């Protein structure tokens, strides 16, 4: 089996492309079924394994398959599934085989590949991806072991290095941007759209600035109200958004919608009603919640996850020593995993050898039983059994030696000498 990771992320693709290859949570299980099917056929020796990780910053397919054309097949499947021309997608895709796939998984879970260096949210997202793949019956020995090791490495990196210390989160970066536009956030009205983990983090950071008003708009009223009350704010129905948008100076949105929920026309009306007082908008969703054309309006300052990434990276340089330490840990663990993987590769060979030897053994035992049944001398039967079994067991190695070239024969002799050194002693 070969490990392979196919994907795009914030390093290789802009948000405009990432949002087009994102997988909503409810689509992942059926997507895994169709994805695995590309490798299910008469030539497949082992059932393929797969998991899909889809976040704001990355969409990745983790695979274990014996298909030699897995890379091309996976990229073509991703292109077809999202109705994207292959020539538009392929330049942004990375394909990482074997040790590169292992190293990548370890780095992602450890926060080394994140926009926010050392952030911990990705671990929970990876665990969700693994849980979903397991529920879909898409995991097996190889990916199960990969992800178990991945989470162990992530824990080791975070507990033995300072990789997460003093990190600038996306939420903190949003506040910093707001402070560049408004003298005081405390004078502004802030609207949060959504009630998930990212909005909760943003609300925590903005609430610390004591804004004039804090409001939450969410599709589920109860959840929106619960979040708003935590910060002494209030909640409004999402349906009121178009008519109430002009009331807010700062709007932060992060929902799971597959289509924009804030269009150009609605923002144009809000700007007009505000008499061109500026609106600061942060769109943390992928796919995006706010139509990108909104950013072209005067008096509107629209930022996406990629824009916030530039601010986040300003704080990453100071932690390069921790990065080097984390990379060293990861490299050691990659080598350990590859040793396990190499050992797994010979399991089918060993199993086949045992099966073949057992077939020979059964045939000889059956032959000996027939000889005993007709009254042959037991000692002679045992001698015949041992001689015949010995001849058949060494027939394969002997045949290989006789047919090998002189160069290969020397290697075989050396290997077989080692085999028989470990075959056991006749002493009791």
UniProtKB/Swiss-Prot annotation:
Q: Which GO terms describe its molecular function?
A: glutamyl-tRNA reductase activity; NADP binding
- Pfam families from the xrefs? GlutR_dimer (PF00745), GlutR_N (PF05201), Shikimate_DH (PF01488)
**Name of the gene:** hemA
Q: Report whether Nuclease shows up as a keyword of the record.
A: no
Pathway where this protein functions: Porphyrin-containing compound metabolism; protoporphyrin-IX biosynthesis; 5-aminolevulinate from L-glutamyl-tRNA(Glu): step 1/2
Q: Per UniProt, where does substrate bind?
A: 55-58, 114, 119-121, 125
Site Important for activity: give positions: 104
Any additional notes? During catalysis, the active site Cys acts as a nucleophile attacking the alpha-carbonyl group of tRNA-bound glutamate with the formation of a thioester intermediate between enzyme and glutamate, and the concomitant release of tRNA(Glu). The thioester intermediate is finally reduced by direct hydride transfer from NADPH, to form the product GSA.
Highest taxon in the source lineage: Bacteria
Q: Which family does it belong to?
A: Belongs to the glutamyl-tRNA reductase family.
**What EC number(s) does its UniProt record assign?**
1.2.1.70
Known catalytic reactions: (S)-4-amino-5-oxopentanoate + tRNA(Glu) + NADP(+) = L-glutamyl-tRNA(Glu) + NADPH + H(+)
Tell me, how does this one assemble? Homodimer.
Q: Which GO terms describe its biological process?
A: protoporphyrinogen IX biosynthetic process from glutamate
Q: Which organism is it from?
A: Paraburkholderia phytofirmans (strain DSM 17436 / LMG 22146 / PsJN)
- InterPro entries under this entry? 4pyrrol_synth_GluRdtase, 4pyrrol_synth_GluRdtase_dimer, 4pyrrol_synth_GluRdtase_N, GluRdtase_CS, GluRdtase_dimer_dom_sf, GluRdtase_N_sf, NAD(P)-bd_dom_sf, Shikm_DH/Glu-tRNA_Rdtase
Q: Which PANTHER family match?
A: GLUTAMYL-TRNA REDUCTASE
Can you name this protein? Glutamyl-tRNA reductase
Q: Which UniProt keywords apply?
A: NADP, Oxidoreductase, Porphyrin biosynthesis
Catalytic positions? 56 (nucleophile)
Q: What does this protein do?
A: Catalyzes the NADPH-dependent reduction of glutamyl-tRNA(Glu) to glutamate 1-semialdehyde (GSA).
Q: What is known of its domains?
A: Possesses an unusual extended V-shaped dimeric structure with each monomer consisting of three distinct domains arranged along a curved 'spinal' alpha-helix. The N-terminal catalytic domain specifically recognizes the glutamate moiety of the substrate. The second domain is the NADPH-binding domain, and the third C-terminal domain is responsible for dimerization.
